[in-house]
C-alpha cells in the first residue's frame, strides 16, 4: 500500500462528507416534532425510500464482508446475493404494505397491539438492542477501514473520526437526516461499486480476464457440492451448507427492525411497494459489482498492489494484508481485501469514489440502527412503559442521548471486533429473525397466533440462538459448524449450518405449536390487527 496520502482521494471523500453535514443541518431545521424524528413525518416517496432501504440494508457486511468471504473461501457467494435480492419482493407481500396500513411509529408497536401485551416492548427491545450493537459495531468497523484507506492513519484514530461523523448527523437529524442521507449514500455506494468493478474488468481485459483471474486464484472456484469432496472450502461442501448460506439473510428484509421501520416513513401503501422495486433494482446492480470485485481480489492484490509490486511480486495476497494489518493496527484485516483490490488499480479517483461509497454504506447502516434503537428505548420504554414525563416532553432529546450511548458502546467493541463484519451481520440476523419474525409474519397472516407463542418463542429462541452461535464460534472454531457436532458426532465438521440457520425454521415451528396449544386471541383483535391489515395488500 502506498504510504502517501493522495489529495485526490481526500478531495472526493471531503465532498461527500460535506454533503452529509449539509443534509444533517437542513434536516435539523425541518425537525418540527417527535414524529419527524422517529418516522420522518411519513412524507418520504418511493424512490428516496427505496434508495434509503438499499443503503441501510446492504451494510458493510455486503460491501466489505461479501468480497472478503469470497477471498477467504474462494467461492463466489452467488446464492447469498440471489437470496438477499430475492428476499426483497417477499417483504412487499408479507410485511411492507400491511405495516404501512397499520402506520406504527416503533418496531415494537405491532407486537404490543397484535398480542395485547404492552410488556412485550421490554423483551423486543432487548433483542433489538443486541442486533443494534452488532450492526452498529460492524458499520463503524467498515467506516474505520475506509478511513484507513483514505488517510493512511492508524485504525483506532480512523474509528474515532468515523464514530464522531455518524454521531453528528444521527443525533441531530433523526430519521429525516437518516433517510435523505441514506438515499444519497445509496447512489454513492452503488456508483462506487459499479465503477470499481468496471475498472477491474477493464484492467483484466474483459470478462475472459476475470474468469482467468478467478481460476488462477482458486482452481476449484466453480465447483459445487456435486463435486464433493473436491470443493472450494469445507463451508460450501454440502447442499445443506449452501441452503444455510442462502437463508441467513433471505428473510431479513421483511422482518429486521432497521428495514421494517423504513416502511413506516413512506406516504402510503403504494409507495411502500414501489420503494421495494427501486431497492431491488439498484441493489442487484450493486451486488453483481461486488461479486466481480470479490472473485478478482486475490489476483489483483498479488499482481498489482503497491506492497506486492515493491516486493518484486513475490508476496501472496494474505502476506500483503498482513503488512497492512501490522502497519495500521487493523483487527480483522480480511475485511480490507476489497479495498486492497481497488488500491491495486493505482487510480486515486476510483479509490476516492470507492471510499466515499464505503463511508456511505457504513454511515447509513449505523444511522438506521441507531434511530431504531433510540425509538425503542426513548419512546417505548421511557414513555409507553415507564411513563416518564420528561421523556414524553422532550422525546427528541432523549432519543439523541440514547443514540449517542449506543454509538459509544459500539465504538469500544469495534476497537477489537469479535468477528468479520459478515459474521457479525449473520449473527444479528439469525438472533433477531428466529426470535421475532414468527410473531410478526404469523401475527399478520395467521389468526391463531397467540400471545403465549410470542413470549415463549421470543425468549426461548433468543437464548438458544445466542448460545448456539457462540458455542459454534468459540468451542468449534467457526459459526458455520453445527453447534453440537462434537457432542453428537465426535467431529466438528460433520454438519455445516452457517450461523446456525436451522434456528429460523425452528422458531416458526415453536411459535405454531405453542399457538395451537394455547388460548386463541380475541376476535376483535384478530379482525383489527390481522384480517384488516392483510386485506387487499
Residue positions per predicted region:
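Membrane-embedded helix-loop-helix hairpins and adjacent transmembrane boundary segments
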Residues: 1-537
